[in-house]
């Protein structure tokens, strides 16, 4: 199954609360932190909401 490597590349400071909350729920805490998540529609929706703050790469595992 595909997985997504998600990296926080821009700080959520100054953005709406729901965007900050989405970053937190993705598991991203500090700038340049990276998490690996399953490629499911729920995660894709969260990424779409904060696409201006994160970098996403598809990986095979």
From Swiss-Prot:
Single biological process term from Gene Ontology: translation
CDD domains: Ribosomal_L30
GO molecular-function terms, A-Z: structural constituent of ribosome
Coiled coil segments of this chain: none
UniProt entry keywords in alphabetical sequence: Ribonucleoprotein, Ribosomal protein
Family as reported in the entry's similarity comment: Belongs to the universal ribosomal protein uL30 family.
Protein name: Large ribosomal subunit protein uL30
Species lineage: Bacteria, Thermotogati, Thermotogota, Thermotogae, Thermotogales
């Amino acid at each position: 199954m595909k997985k997504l490597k998600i990296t926080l590349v821009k700080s959520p400071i100054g953005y709406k609360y729901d965007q900050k909350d989405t970053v937190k729920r993705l598991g991203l805490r500090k700038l340049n932190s990276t998490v690996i998540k399953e490629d499911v529609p729920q995660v894709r929706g969260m990424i779409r909401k904060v696409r201006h703050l994160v970098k996403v790469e598809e990986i095979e595992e």
